[in-house]
Amino acid sequence: MTKNLYLGVMSGTSLDGVDLCVMDFAKNPPKLTACGFTPMPEDLRTDLSHLLKSGETSLQKLGEIDHRLGLLYAESIKRFLAEHQLSASDIQAIGCHGQTVWHSPNGNFPFTMQIGDMNLVAAHTGITTIADFRRKDMAVGGQGAPLVPAFHEGIFASPERLTVVLNIGGISNISVLAPQQPTIGYDVSVGNALMDSWIELHQAKRYDKNAEWAKTGTLIPALLDSLLDEPFFKLPAPKSTGRELFNLEWLAKKSANLTAYRPEDVQRTLAEFTVQSVVNELKTLESEKQCLLLACGGGARNPLLMQRFSELLPKWQVATTDEYGLDIDYVEAAAFAWLAYQRVHNLTNNLPSVTGAKEPVSLGVIYPK
């Protein structure tokens, strides 16, 4: 059978590295046929982390990081294809998200910025590359995010149940797939970002593996209440957020004196905050039908988070996308392969019910090989 392969490439707010996956669109539904990961080089991660945390840089530095990211994507793709015995001619197109460095969808001059020079990606791989997916949605009045729910709808929706796909990356976002209703999707809260930043500050680790550190801590109710008292949670959907809100500076403002607490107690509280802020939103969506929560992203491998979701959502079946045929670490990368497929065929790939756009459009800028 003839294959119709597209390569999705994603690097998220966690800055851990580059996810890559190949989707075969000759299959119905499309099938994930290969996936891989390239760690972010430490020097590039440090520069990106500083840029994300401060929002400040020089044009010279920004241009250099843009170039370095483009090279990282290109080299990651070439190595990935070689490892899976694929050639450039096997791939119809690449869908590459780029690296978000700022997302500001509100105000008089809404904008979003993803960097990583896609001219380098197309030139170095010899594969047509699709990128810059978010700005056209914003140009027609949308938030530019989230883009993945349209893909979730095609893969996971069922007329028999309410399905919510929860992606726990740096930020937590959901796709709400309700029978006979338009799909909606939006950012609901922080994901791993605060927990990752906190353990990096105190233990120089990138993340709290298996919640081992958080499990040694004790919940701080007063801090939890303060964190949950955040105006973002009261905003109507669709809405989007990022590290420009949920960061260590925000955390410090939410507590009179963070240093008065044991760091592990703060970590346990941040884990609980991540769960409860999401659960509060999910409970507003509960229906009489069966309710299924499908978790994906790095946070779906956190046993403490998954345990607390199960405990706080007794009416829901709580599972991961692994159990439904899509590796939890590669759902977003798979979505960008789908977005590229739609763009190449000039099909719409945004959902106005999700982003708030005035009309459906075909997102993505084409960089020919």
Swiss-Prot record:
It holds the Pfam family AnmK. The keyword Transferase applies. InterPro entries: Anhydro_N_Ac-Mur_kinase, ATPase_NBD. Keywords: ATP-binding, Carbohydrate metabolism, Kinase, Nucleotide-binding, Transferase. It catalyses: 1,6-anhydro-N-acetyl-beta-muramate + ATP + H2O = N-acetyl-D-muramate 6-phosphate + ADP + H(+). Its EC number is 2.7.1.170. SUPFAM superfamilies: Actin-like ATPase domain. The keyword DNA-binding does not apply. GO terms for biological process: 1,6-anhydro-N-acetyl-beta-muramic acid catabolic process; amino sugar metabolic process; peptidoglycan turnover. It comes from the Bacteria. GO terms for molecular function: ATP binding; kinase activity; phosphotransferase activity, alcohol group as acceptor. Pathway: Amino-sugar metabolism; 1,6-anhydro-N-acetylmuramate degradation; Cell wall biogenesis; peptidoglycan recycling. ATP binds at residues 12-19. CDD domains: ASKHA_NBD_ANMK (cd24050). Catalyzes the specific phosphorylation of 1,6-anhydro-N-acetylmuramic acid (anhMurNAc) with the simultaneous cleavage of the 1,6-anhydro ring, generating MurNAc-6-P. Is required for the utilization of anhMurNAc either imported from the medium or derived from its own cell wall murein, and thus plays a role in cell wall recycling. Belongs to the anhydro-N-acetylmuramic acid kinase family. This is Anhydro-N-acetylmuramic acid kinase. It comes from Actinobacillus pleuropneumoniae serotype 5b (strain L20). The lineage of its organism: Bacteria, Pseudomonadati, Pseudomonadota, Gammaproteobacteria, Pasteurellales. The gene is anmK.
